[in-house]
Amino acid sequence: MPVRAILTDIEGTTSAVSFVFDVLFPYAREHLPAFVRRHAAEAEVATQLEAVRAESGEADADIERVIEILLGWIAEDRKATPLKALQGMVWEQGYRASALKGHVYPDAVATMRRWKHEGYQLYVYSSGSIQAQRLIFGCSEAGDLSPLFSGYFDTTSGPKREAASYVRIAEAIGRPPAEILFLSDVLQELDAARAAGMCTCGLAREGGELDGHPTVSSFTAIEPAAC
C-alpha cells in the first residue's frame, strides 16, 4: 500500500533538540510564573491550572504552589498536557513579540515543501501542544511553514510510545496506518508506530542506527515512495 501521508515528530527530527532545551524551555521557565499570575483568572488558563492540581494530586494548591509544580515539571522535562498547554501560551507571546523564531532544519524545510508539491499530506505529532507546534512552524526562521501541514497531533491523542496513539491518529487522518510514514529520532516511538501498522523512518542526525527501522541523517535521504 503506497504512502499517502507523512507524520513527523519535531524535536530531534524537523528541529534541533537544542532549540527546545536551550531556547524554548528557558524562555518558558523565565516567563511562566508572571504569565500564570497575570492570567490565572482567565478561563483558558484557569482550566489548565485545575488540570495541574488534578494531575499533581494537590487539589487545594494555590497559585504559587501551582507555579512551583510547573517549574518542577519543566526541570524534569515531564510530558504533562497542562504544562505543555501553558508553555504554548507563553511561547505564543514570545513568537508574537519576535523574541522567538522556530528552528527547522533547512533539509526538512526543502524536503517537506517538495513532498507537499508532490501531493503528500503532512502532519505533525509531538509531545508539545498543538499550539506550540503551530508556532514553531508558523513563526519559523524559514518563514510561515504552516501551509505545508494538514493537521497536528499532541499528547491528547495519547502517549507517543503507545501503539494505540498511532491507531487513533490514523483514524483521525482517515487513512489506513500502512499509508502513513512516521518520522522520529526516538526508537520507542518508531516501534509504537510500526506496531500500529505505519511505515517508519528514523532520523539520526549525528549518525548511527535506530534498530529495526530504516535510518537516515537528513530529510533529503527519505523516499516515501520506497517505503
Curated annotation (Swiss-Prot):
Pathway: Amino-acid biosynthesis; L-methionine biosynthesis via salvage pathway; L-methionine from S-methyl-5-thio-alpha-D-ribose 1-phosphate: step 3/6; Amino-acid biosynthesis; L-methionine biosynthesis via salvage pathway; L-methionine from S-methyl-5-thio-alpha-D-ribose 1-phosphate: step 4/6. Keywords: Amino-acid biosynthesis, Hydrolase, Magnesium, Metal-binding, Methionine biosynthesis. GO terms for molecular function: 2,3-diketo-5-methylthiopentyl-1-phosphate enolase activity; 2-hydroxy-3-keto-5-methylthiopentenyl-1-phosphate phosphatase activity; acireductone synthase activity; magnesium ion binding. InterPro entries: Enolase-ppase_E1 (IPR023943), HAD-like_sf (IPR036412), HAD-SF_hydro_IA (IPR006439), HAD_sf (IPR023214). Its cofactor is Mg(2+). Its EC number is 3.1.3.77. HAMAP family: Salvage_MtnC. This is Enolase-phosphatase E1. The gene is mtnC.
